[in-house]
Amino acid sequence: MAGTVDAQEHVAKPRRPNIFRVLRRTGYGKCLVCSLLLILCFFYATFCHVKHEAYSGSQPLLIYQHGPCAQGYNFVPIVFGLMLYIVYLMECWHSRTKIINMKKVRVEDALDYITALRTSPPIVWWKSVCYHYTRKTRQVTRYRNGDAVSATQVYYERMNSHQAGSMFIYDTCGFRDISKSILEVEKFHVTRIRLSRSFVFANMQAATEFEQQRSRFFNDNETKDDYMEVREGMDLSDVGFVEEILAFNKPTPPWFLHPIVFWFFSIFVLSWPLRIYTEWRTAVLSFQVIKLFGTNYLSPNSVNYTGPLTRTSTMDTVELEALLRREQHFVVPSYSEVMLMQNTIANSNTNYPNIRCLDPVILPRPFVSTTNEHIVLRNYGATETDNSLSEPITATPRPLRVSRSMTFAAQGNLEESAENLSCLENGSRANRAIPSSRRNLPLRSLSIGGISAWSNGYREIGNPDDSQLLIEPDEPPPPYEVALRMCAPLYERLRRSISSRLASISHSSSKDLKSLTLKSSSSNNNNNNSNNNNNDDPEHP
């Protein structure tokens, strides 16, 4: 059903308007007003001739009648009607000229022309004209009181100094025609096809490339002179563009478009009804030739492929967060977000028993690594025997410390922060042993991107024979909805962006520092005041 709707939306069909739409859009008001005034003048003269015999000539010249048909007044509608008739004929000629200048072809030729428009490559061009104004003088002669007086007139003339043109080079991004298909044109005797052209971008890469070329051209030419006139547009190569076409399904046009019929109706002041009938019998088709730039970035076969344009790549942060809440997308947490998620990770095992503590495996390596390429995290359905390890390293865990850059509490609170990561720790505090050579080193940061061999909280891999399966062998994997609910705490903590979290933390830390500074300054002032009082009072013990 969706495919049928999409196919219908991508098809253009001509439609014949009803009589009310014709009157509202193309009412031909000038022709209608002239026709009505001519008819009124004709009835006025007819009434005077029938009622008072104003134009018979049998009445004596010295007898004057009073009223609208008196002598003198009876010629007003005739003169006014003749003037209106001339204006009416000029308006009819102007309307007929528009039809004559319109391109009239067969339906087959019109479809071939539209196909040529769709297959022709686009040309998006820019033109600039740099100019300045030059101050000039000239001698003019003026007359005052009949005497000729010469004067010097100062005027400014525009001088074009530089002209340049360029066009959009789309070899890298590529293009494709996405115009609609035309159907059912042969069903109507006359079809008025209105053509237009435009271009769109498939992704931000193509739009950025277009804007860079356009800005570069204008920036290079705007320094040529004082002023710059800009022109830009779109053409189609090797095809002349026509805005309107009349297409006939027969070799000869219909009778209401014949010039003899048109002038016959116009002479008898019936041009307006003929025009309304012509518009009512003519189907209208609005067709737009659309060129899409950036197809190479969407084609997997192209070297410039960057993936399809998604909705999230064009939305701002508010819409992206709303989409996350609605569709529950998951984002890999950053270092700062991990440091802020300590309590959530510690409590995730109690709130959701299906989520197990991640037990990485430390592989034997001679040096301390800064990446997690050798850290194997157990996932759903994995076993401790799935790792092809040679011999585990006996490494003594050391207590996990919070990053110095993310620590805003006192030094005594570091042990409480380390105890909050209980899900990552399996040994007791008594069993922690740190090499003596590393005890006095500064605090190290906990990073997901890199966990060294001295990282704390990861128990050693024991004998592979006593490993336990995380799930039963015959237990199927959980469905997608269950997996979403399992990761709900992580998702809830990632609603806010990292920038907002860091801003709130820095704001709170700055407030604490300000309060501490104010307290220390106040205490210093009090001490200074007390010292001054003691110095002023020598008898004070």
Curated annotation (Swiss-Prot):
Q: What is this protein called?
A: Transmembrane protein 151 homolog
Record flagged with keyword Glycoprotein: no
Task: Give one Pfam hit by family name.
Answer: TMEM151
Renumbered to this chain, region (Disordered) spans 503-541
Q: What InterPro entries would the database entry show?
A: Tmem151 (IPR026767)
* Homology family: Belongs to the TMEM151 family.
Its source organism is Caenorhabditis elegans
Q: Where does the chain cross the membrane?
A: 27-47, 73-93, 254-274
